[in-house]
Swiss-Prot record:
InterPro entries in the record: Ribosomal_bL9_N_sf
GO biological process terms held by the UniProt record: mitochondrial translation
Domain of life, source organism: Eukaryota
Keyword Ribosomal protein recorded: yes
Main location: mitochondrion
Keyword Ribonucleoprotein: yes
Name of the featured protein: Large ribosomal subunit protein bL9m
Assembly, per entry: Component of the mitochondrial large ribosomal subunit (mt-LSU). Mature yeast 74S mitochondrial ribosomes consist of a small (37S) and a large (54S) subunit. The 37S small subunit contains a 15S ribosomal RNA (15S mt-rRNA) and 34 different proteins. The 54S large subunit contains a 21S rRNA (21S mt-rRNA) and 46 different proteins.
């Protein structure tokens, strides 16, 4: 008799369906690295990862996972996490220093306060009419 060769799936099941794979090569474009066990879309596996032995399908967790590669990936991931934490701490201290410098540049250092000299205008000065001499004017 005839057997069904295709399964009719809805758009939701196609969109959410993932397959479990172990990556055998680095794929930084997809943020997948050697030894990593990941759930990816079947199309990604078919079109990119499976080519040239870049990844393998995992059908049973006990037998198909290469534990040596997985341990290498876990040590690499731990090292990268430590480096990332150190980098973030350095970045945070640099940001704090920059903020302090900006505050100092905006608000300025505490300047030595000089006594302000009052501007003496013409009306404020003690000049009287007797002191002013205008040629040709006799008072």
């Amino acid at each position: 008799m005839l057997h069904c060769t295709q399964v009719c799936l809805s758009a939701l099941t196609k969109r959410t369906h993932r397959v479990k794979v172990q990556v055998l090569k680095d794929f930084p474009r997809f943020q997948l690295y050697k030894g990593q066990v990941a759930n990816v879309k079947p199309s990604l596996m078919r079109n990119y990862l499976h080519n040239f032995n870049g990844a393998k399908y995992i059908l049973s967790e006990e037998h198909d996972i290469n534990t040596e590669l997985l341990k290498q990936y876990q040590t690499l991931e731990a090292k990268l996490e430590e480096d990332h934490q150190q980098l973030s701490k350095r970045h945070e201290t640099e940001v704090q220093k920059n903020m302090e410098l900006r505050k100092e540049s905006v608000f300025g250092h505490k300047k030595e306060e000089k006594p302000k000299e009052e501007k003496k205008g013409l009306l404020d000065s003690g000049i009287t009419i007797e002191e002013v001499k205008i040629p040709g004017l006799d008072i």
